[in-house]
């Protein structure tokens, strides 16, 4: 919004030219979202406590988690509010990627809100059924897939997927690309949701992935840089950096309250939309497989659940003491904070490897 207000006045007051620069507006976005979280955080935590919107902890989980029972949840509302407000202020609202990301934020955020609401209403740790959540995610992903098919940002690469570390090598999904889009969005949304089981674990890794994708988006949107790095140039993708920096600021602000011992949990209200928008960004900038590496912590967490379910149904035995994977390490005796920090470190290492893929080919 600020771009549309001030940049058009730059002919009258030259300093307003600064609003044309993505780097300036991205800086404004991260500071705004961070400030909103810091200021609104205590108020939202208090309101959630007053309305008794509190976490229902699974009784079959680690015993150390029983103390978390009663911690305010639905904190994803704080993240969503700060991301949307900051993006609305600093991004160009005529950019189609921004409009889609805001739509995805609200759609998946509402889906997560419904899940959290049902958990509170039933006083149970189970809200929406898995089928209902996947259906809601799939509907949105299918609409986006249709849009990307009929209005691709770069028709030449519309159904191609870049393979990291291999120069100029692409996989052509052809008519299966729509299915690929659905898998990316549904998969990333649920992977983050499954990772959100320890204080600060999911939001810390979201910060790492979102910050890294910010740079990838900026590179993809800059013709000279994209050409130098031999990645697909996507017109308008640089604006995505502003949205992602809003996510980074919100994540850091939320981590202030979500770090161990957590004062608030994001719930599905936060995790579903955060995972979903990361998947959307990877599709927009044509770095879908880089997200698999960059978000490797989320991928491994999701795979641990799938492996556990599949193996248990086939043999009646468990591969892990408990899934997702972070609970397995807790059951082995590692402290919650140690598991969280080690997963953060793994996230940083994966981010470094992801950036290495830009040059090591």
UniProtKB/Swiss-Prot annotation:
Its cofactor is Mg(2+). The chain crosses the membrane at residues 26-46, 71-91, 97-117, 134-154, 168-188, 200-220, 236-256, 264-284, 290-310, 338-358. It is found in: Cell membrane. It catalyses: UDP-N-acetyl-alpha-D-muramoyl-L-alanyl-gamma-D-glutamyl-meso-2,6-diaminopimeloyl-D-alanyl-D-alanine + di-trans,octa-cis-undecaprenyl phosphate = di-trans,octa-cis-undecaprenyl diphospho-N-acetyl-alpha-D-muramoyl-L-alanyl-D-glutamyl-meso-2,6-diaminopimeloyl-D-alanyl-D-alanine + UMP. One of its GO terms (cellular component) is plasma membrane. Keywords: Cell cycle, Cell division, Cell membrane, Cell shape, Cell wall biogenesis/degradation, Magnesium, Membrane, Metal-binding, Peptidoglycan synthesis, Transferase, Transmembrane, Transmembrane helix. It is a multi-pass membrane protein. GO terms for biological process: cell division; cell wall organization; peptidoglycan biosynthetic process; regulation of cell shape. Its EC number is 2.7.8.13. It is an enzyme of class 2 (transferase). Pathway: Cell wall biogenesis; peptidoglycan biosynthesis. InterPro entries: Glycosyl_transferase_4 (IPR000715), PNAcMuramoyl-5peptid_Trfase (IPR003524), PNAcMuramoyl-5peptid_Trfase_CS (IPR018480). It comes from the Bacteria. Belongs to the glycosyltransferase 4 family. MraY subfamily. Catalyzes the initial step of the lipid cycle reactions in the biosynthesis of the cell wall peptidoglycan: transfers peptidoglycan precursor phospho-MurNAc-pentapeptide from UDP-MurNAc-pentapeptide onto the lipid carrier undecaprenyl phosphate, yielding undecaprenyl-pyrophosphoryl-MurNAc-pentapeptide, known as lipid I. This is Phospho-N-acetylmuramoyl-pentapeptide-transferase.
